[in-house]
Swiss-Prot record:
GO terms for cellular component: extracellular region. This is Defensin-like protein 54. Keywords: Antimicrobial, Disulfide bond, Fungicide, Plant defense, Secreted, Signal. Residues 1-27 form the signal peptide. GO terms for biological process: defense response to fungus; killing of cells of another organism. It comes from Arabidopsis thaliana (Mouse-ear cress). Belongs to the DEFL family. Its main location: secreted.
Length: 79
């Protein structure tokens, strides 16, 4: 009986650890873009950091732009 109880406890700790690590990833994807201004579009192979920077700096109120978050979005920073 003691072996089953210990095994169940270890199993639950592993499951909780894995589930909390997913919450951290989700929180990062929400918090990180909040540091920036407008997030215009999703970044992909065609739209990378360079394209994001170019699009943001063409608007007069933004100083720069970066692909941030998960999934990555082009977010502009006011200057």
């Amino acid at each position: 009986m003691g072996i089953k109880k210990t095994s169940a406890t270890v199993f639950l700790v592993i499951i909780l650890t894995i589930s909390f690590s997913y919450y951290d990833v989700e929180a990062e994807s929400v918090i990180e873009p909040a540091k920036y201004g407008a997030c215009l579009f999703l970044c992909d192979a065609r739209r990378d950091d360079h394209a994001c920077f170019y699009d943001c700096t063409n608007v007069a109120i933004y100083r720069t732009g970066h692909c941030v978050g998960n999934p990555p979005r082009c977010c502009c920073i006011r200057g």
